Amino acid sequence: MGYYALFYDVVDDFVERRAPFRTEHLKLADEANRRGELVLAGALAEPADGALIIFRGDDPNVASSFAKNDPYVQNGLVKNWEVRPWTVVVGGEARAGVSDTGGDA
């Protein structure tokens, strides 16, 4: 199992336009959380120009499937989205005894 970060780049008037789709978006997120796939999620602030959603799964499809089914994506509130593997170094299920080796963060 690994972690995957889903990044959303949203439209300029996202906050004003999201209301009709928010309940379904949150339902989708809650279901993914209950299945143990969605770990953390939230909008970026100041400015509200994106969102970050962290998933845990066997492959990046856990995150891309969410995005493809998200009402925010389907209704044009998300301009672009990207899934990237996330290497957890500290916290959660990270290996114990992390030291500064000068490598990746």
Outline where the language-model segments fall.
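Conserved, structured core segments of small domains
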Residues: 1-105
